[in-house]
Amino acid sequence: MDILTLIFYSIYLMIPAYLANGSALVFGGGTPMDFGHYCWDNRRLIGNGVTWRGTVCGGLFGMVIGGILGLLATYGIGSYFFNITASQITFMSGFVPQGLLVGFLLGFGALIGDAIGSFLKRRLNFERGKPVPLLDQLDFVVVSLLFVSTVVSLSLEMIVIIILVSIFLHLGANMFAYMINLKDVWY
């Protein structure tokens, strides 16, 4: 696979993770995932920023996006890229079920990664909303890649591309969310 195709495939594969991560901000609110509990260091386990509603709705949104990508592939839209993923999932057939599975893994992986990132930030004594470069951009990426790697092979080149692209996409998305008043900070 040439480098340009690999870049496009990497972005295509991550669409459910990217959209799930962003949608948690829209769907979020309600009960914090840590239920307000504190850790051994007398700081919140995760904090108010990661909620059950945002995590569940965002994860399901990622799954739906994966299903939509699978459905579009049945009509030839993005089918080249979807076939690369689908050909590796041998225990189930059909683009839509395969898309739902990949979307589920990427979507929930992204949001669990975000929760892990929040946990780490609290342990490192960073307050909610304070920037922690690279952790802020990559927590959701790393865990979503771990989850999806259970069904899809990821080359080292692909992982590097996803990490690099994700850093810039994440910063751009945060700036946009800040401009439309969905976030209090631009980073």
UniProtKB/Swiss-Prot annotation:
Its EC number is 2.7.7.67. Catalyzes the formation of CDP-2,3-bis-(O-geranylgeranyl)-sn-glycerol (CDP-archaeol) from 2,3-bis-(O-geranylgeranyl)-sn-glycerol 1-phosphate (DGGGP) and CTP. This reaction is the third ether-bond-formation step in the biosynthesis of archaeal membrane lipids. It is a multi-pass membrane protein. The lineage of its organism: Archaea, Methanobacteriati, Methanobacteriota, Methanomada group, Methanobacteria. It comes from Methanosphaera stadtmanae (strain ATCC 43021 / DSM 3091 / JCM 11832 / MCB-3). The keyword Magnesium applies. It catalyses: 2,3-bis-O-(geranylgeranyl)-sn-glycerol 1-phosphate + CTP + H(+) = CDP-2,3-bis-O-(geranylgeranyl)-sn-glycerol + diphosphate. Its main location: membrane. It is found in: Cell membrane. NCBIfam families: PRK04032.1. GO terms for biological process: glycerophospholipid biosynthetic process. One of its GO terms (cellular component) is plasma membrane. This is CDP-archaeol synthase. GO terms for molecular function: CDP-2,3-bis-(O-geranylgeranyl)-sn-glycerol synthase activity. Its cofactor is Mg(2+). Pfam families: CarS-like. Belongs to the CDP-archaeol synthase family.
